[in-house]
Amino acid sequence: MKSLTLRRPDDWHLHLRDGAMLEGVIGDTSRHFARAIIMPNLVPPVVTTADASAYRERILKAIPEGDRFEPLMTLYLTEDTVADDVEEGKKSGLITAVKLYPAGATTNSHGGVRDFNKAMPVLERMAKIGLPLCVHGEVTTPDVDIFDREKAFIDTVLEPLRQRLPELKVTMEHITTRDGVDYIKSSNANLAGSITTHHLIINRNAILVGGIKPHYYCLPVAKREEHRLALRAAATSGDARFFLGTDSAPHVDPLKECACGCAGIYTSINTMSCLAHVFEDENALDKLEAFASLNGPAWYGLAPNDETITLVKREEAVAFPEKIETGAGPVTVFDPMFPLHWDVN
């Protein structure tokens, strides 16, 4: 039986939500992952270190008994964020990064940044103290096509920001385009990118061909096949600038299966099985540990995990539930549209 042992992975972009949903989904992450960067776009958002501390305590209380899991907290950047509070959060060890959502870019992002000049004092302080900025890299202006938002963000927002603050460490989260891959590769320093599980597997046909498939709808939206292939090449290359951030984002089914459905795909439960399939397809199983377990910690200045997990390839396909039941309601699990034979032993 084929097997692969690697250091326990981390998830560098995760939505856990709160309340009953948090309690219903956290076990799917804590079973396999040692750490995760937790997104702050709650309602209301996590905007201060006090908010982050309280949210962290709720997460810790929800972790299933026996699981060892560390939530890495972030702050939601607004035009009113206080630089001293951000610095204190970093000094205390509570805050791992600050998250930039352009206003209106994704779920619960309406309080995000509209005028970057108002956020510059905080960004300048972050550059000074070495605190990374995680960016949702899309513009939201109505004249830009949704499939072009990432390229437009690089050209009109990110590159000018990095020219102005070259010492600011920036993570381009959930990149979805060849443009994003090439931009990161062209950088000499202070730029890296996370890649989701689902963007390695689906292109925009998955959402639109044969009827609208709401459970493949996410933001940033999946792009053309050429972009998916560029992401796969980057993820499986071993390049230290690319690492796993699942962007696993649970929504109850009624909020997905409606006239104006929410963006988000739930992948925490089967991510490692999906990744092993993808990396085996690319003859790159030897690069999976770098992508899932090594590159992310190195970028964020943390040691890799000492614990290991073992993936085993089984003859029979591994059965994952079509849905998970949470106290908030049912959540549909990502279906990669191929049988999964790799299993976490």
Swiss-Prot record:
Keyword Hydrolase: yes
EC category name: hydrolase
Pfam families: Amidohydro_1 (PF01979)
Residue positions binding Zn(2+) 1: 13, 15, 99, 247
Pathway membership, UniProt: Pyrimidine metabolism; UMP biosynthesis via de novo pathway; (S)-dihydroorotate from bicarbonate: step 3/3
Assigned keywords, A-Z: Hydrolase, Metal-binding, Pyrimidine biosynthesis, Zinc
InterPro entries attached to this UniProt entry: Amidohydro-rel, DHOdimr, Dihydroorotase_CS, Metal_Hydrolase
Function: Catalyzes the reversible cyclization of carbamoyl aspartate to dihydroorotate.
Description of how the protein assembles with itself and partners: Homodimer.
Name of the protein in its database record: Dihydroorotase
Lineage per the UniProt record: Bacteria, Pseudomonadati, Pseudomonadota, Alphaproteobacteria, Hyphomicrobiales
